[in-house]
UniProtKB/Swiss-Prot annotation:
Keywords: Mitochondrion, mRNA processing. This is Mitochondrial RNA-splicing protein MRS1. It is found in: Mitochondrion. PANTHER family: CRUCIFORM CUTTING ENDONUCLEASE 1, MITOCHONDRIAL-RELATED (PTHR28072:SF1). Function in mitochondrial RNA splicing in the excision of mitochondrial group I introns aI1 and aI5 beta from COX1 and bI3 from COB transcripts and thus would be involved in obtaining the correct structure of the intron, to allow the RNA catalyzed reactions to occur. InterPro entries: Mrs1/Cce1, RNaseH_sf, Ydc2_cat.
Amino acid sequence: MSPKNLTRSVVPAIDLYCRKANFKTLKFLSMILCSKKEWYDNTKAPVRNFLVSRCAVFEQLRNRLVDEGKVNLFGVFLTNDSFSFCKMTVDDKFDTSLVDWQKIPFDYSFATERRQHISLLPPDTLFATEKIISLLGVSPNMANLVSIERQRSDLMDFSCKLQSNILEHLLYAKCQGVQVTSTNEEARLLAAICNPEFIDAFWCELTPIRASLKENPSISVPQEYQIYDPVIRATIKEVVAKRLLRSAFDNDIDPLMRLRLDKGWKFKFPTLSSTTDLDFSLKDCLSLDTRRDAYDMTEVFLATMASSKTLRTYSNLVDIVMKDNGRFDSGILKQFNDYVKQEKLNLQNFQAGSSEFLKGVKI
């Protein structure tokens, strides 16, 4: 039988259409699936292989969503002295609800033998990892995807970098295969590493900045700033988080991201009640101590929100490639390519909405 006529399961079918797509389409696909890395070569194979490995994780999540009607998504951001996390629930209509959002310091309760801080001894790092998982609020009756990110800074000393690396590896290993209850045959925890470049590309890379920065009174030489500058990306991400919170708080649900806040959150965010538009700071809104805390909370919020949108995009791609049981068809390839281009355009239009707010922020 010709390979063209073979039926395929979902992930091999995704792989097939990625092979048939051109490199430009694969780069767009990487972005809309929040998997865009700064590739240093122009070959399809490494991009495709990485994409397919990411799709394999989302395929498990998609199957659970089909079977159970809801899944939990978590974003975790590890630093040397704390961790931040965000929890959202996605239903089978891809409406997304914010469930929990916290920053928790690594105090003595994360250490063993009455130590005041986490040591690098294996029992301590393992204990801290299990404590983190226990605080996330995973649901034994639902699938839970944990996206893990750690602080990356040249200013961190070696022991702090080592601790973050160890916790990241242990958390990934524990979430990748652990069962929340012994009665379930299938693991209820899934894990994915969330590199900062994924989040930056998904929320920032297509944002037009030049015209807005020229009108920003706090910037004397706007030409000095580029979209890849960390300060610009951090500013854009804060703007995006505020846009999403404001639209959800006002029940003006963004059609692309579909975030919802229940009444409980509206009581927790009094700052949003007393302000209009984006005239508030995340630091004050979330009752945080420092701007660094606000940055960490923004990272986990946007990582979790990106997972929700990625799951919906991936599910739509599955519907396309499985129209003929995974067989190759040139008409389906065109639909695949067109959908990727349209989703990239949708993301570009969403990012463009952040540009206007760059005129008034202090950079």
